[in-house]
């Protein structure tokens, strides 16, 4: 009898602990739940659809390597539909440019721009391609309702790389 009671007690603790929390904490420490999360997601979606936002990098995660925390501010910014990025690149390059800076540097209007809002998972996904004279970048940006997200960049001449940071407008 004692073991059954102990088992039920432990089982109820596990169920309570695994219930999860639907509270999201934003970058500035605010806790959002329910309606606030939906409003924040709509605000982020609006910023992205209007083409006016800045994604600020907090850490860089090269494929097959440990995270790197840059001491300089790197951003992907969109202003009036023009996307600009100057980002560090750590990883394998399959074609090195002589005298180049080695980073990911682009400016222009995105091609194949696709914005998808997933209200069930509280995130916005942005996919686009940027063609530069010497390189093409396929960019995927996923932002959650807490304004924190992941940006992954794929190029035919480099290994994929991910950047973690937050979005602001």
Q: At which residue positions do the language-model features occur?
A:
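C-terminal motif of bacterial Sec signal peptides marking the signal peptidase cleavage site
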Residues: 14-17
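Phosphoinositide-binding peripheral membrane targeting modules
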Residues: 67-70, 75-76, 85-121
């Amino acid at each position: 009898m004692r073991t059954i009671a102990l088992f039920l007690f432990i089982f109820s603790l596990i169920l309570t602990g695994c219930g999860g929390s639907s509270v999201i904490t934003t970058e500035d420490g605010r806790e959002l739940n329910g309606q606030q999360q939906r409003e924040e997601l709509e605000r982020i979606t609006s910023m992205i659809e209007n083409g006016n936002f800045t994604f600020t990098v907090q850490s860089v995660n090269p494929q097959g390597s440990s995270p790197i925390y840059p001491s300089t501010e790197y951003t992907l910014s969109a202003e009036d539909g023009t996307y600009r990025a100057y980002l560090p690149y750590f990883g394998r390059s399959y074609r090195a440019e002589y005298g180049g800076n080695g980073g990911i540097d682009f400016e222009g209007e995105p091609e194949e721009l696709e914005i998808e809002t997933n209200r069930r998972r509280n995130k916005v996904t942005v996919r686009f391609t940027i063609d530069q004279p010497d390189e093409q970048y396929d960019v995927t940006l996923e932002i959650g309702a807490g304004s924190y997200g992941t940006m992954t960049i794929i190029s035919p001449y480099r290994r994929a790389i991910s950047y973690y940071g937050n979005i602001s407008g």
